[in-house]
Amino acid sequence: MNAWFAEVQQKFIADFIEKDRWTYITDGLKITIIVTLLALILGLILGILIAMVRCTHDQTHPKWFRSPGNFFLKLADAICRLYITVIRGTPTLVQLLIINFVILVSAQKITVAVITFGINSGAYVAEIIRGGIMGVDKGQMEAGRSLGMSYVTTMKDIILPQAMKSALPALINEMITLL
């Protein structure tokens, strides 16, 4: 048994230290960190935009043909719901294979990974942020609006800071999952 450990130690030293194979591990770690950070940024941007569309639709309840803005908000909400349902309903590996071999065939592999993981993370982040926004008391929006603030200003200055505070643990979990 002791000879086996000595042999494993000798092979480890020969492979990783003497033949400089440890550089493969550090190169892989660099790529992993780059892909994770870029996908995280893309996922946060997508998630916040989609959550805002979904929450605006849920809070205003627009009718289809009252105005062109209502029509586009309904259409954007339907597209966002479809995106979230499809992306959250398919495995990440399947998404990676489809984007790599069907959609972005000639792209670099790191670019494909960033886009795929960013799109996947965006769907989860959207639901996390939407849950945080919906968790803020309705009176907060009414208070901001009664002070003369616009809907966008009320969301930006009053609702989103409270929502991000309550959604932060779930967002950190999503970031760890992305890693």
Label every model-predicted segment.
Residues 1-179:
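Transmembrane alpha-helices and adjacent helix-loop boundaries
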